[in-house]
Amino acid sequence: MKFNFLSKSVQNYLINKASTLAEALPYIRQHTGKNIVIKYGGHAMGDAALAKKFSQDIGLIKEVGINPIIVHGGGPQIGAMLKKKNIKTKFVEGLRITDKKTVKIVEKVLSKDINKKIVSDINLTGGKAESFSGNINNLIQAKKLKIAIKESDSNIERILDLGFVGEPTKINIKKILISIKKGKIPVIAPLGIDKNGNTYNINADTVAGA
């Protein structure tokens, strides 16, 4: 019989992991075989150490039989790119007012830069992630988001036009389930598309909760 001798550091690592798994065992038993949606914020992914740990944890969740579905944000990264392009943006109720020029940058940052990086990070740590962008193949059908605000002086309510900021009307769950069935971890960029082919920037928390 062949024995593998482990270094002290590897032993400590395995002991720590075993301890973590022991603590998580009730949760694992409760959610084994279930699909869970995890929102991954832009601030967290900006820290290399946190990003690596997140990827490792997602791989571990998949290994124990739970199916993670990642919906990511990207606010800080979008802000940095807009600043680089000398494009000024305003926020209302935490939502970025998004014109046609801005939405193209938002789409690139979310679907091409951030999404691909998360998929790569998960794959590098041993997971099998698959990239999805909500505005491709009608994954996330959307409509323009309308929010009502009251004028402070007159108390009159008016509808604010946020541009290409949307909300989901329908999510094509079938495509995501096919990915999970293939053993993949879906990673979704929070973009949507309407019946006229317009792309919308959607809040990641809204997509995760849809």
Question: Model-derived features: where do they sit?
Answer:
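Nucleotide/pyrophosphate-binding catalytic subdomain
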Residues: 1-210
